[in-house]
């Protein structure tokens, strides 16, 4: 059983495999932001997408995310987007040394709890992120 939902710019695919159900609820995703380096602090990340869902504790899950474009703010600057499952980073998209990345997709595996939160965090030195096509997917959960 595959159900599709789209809220704002956040597309969610929920797949039920071998009776391991994952039910999803979503929040909105921001379409873009500019992140500026803070003196004495460094660069900070911003949550750009959030997905919450219930699962069976101990199950493994495959999660994917994509970011349309990440632009570092200069030739010596870096930008990152992190995939975070229940406060642990499980995947990264990186744009380094001033080179932008476009259409990057990362899939990563993690372990579920009963109630799960997946986030995409992005940030960097004067980073601009175009997130209009950002997607966050729960591909499957399995025992």
Stretch-by-stretch model annotation:
Residues 1-30, 34:
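Fibrous stalk/shaft segments of extracellular and virion attachment machinery
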Residues 22-143:
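Extracellular jelly-roll beta-sandwich "head" domains, especially the C-terminal globular C1q domain
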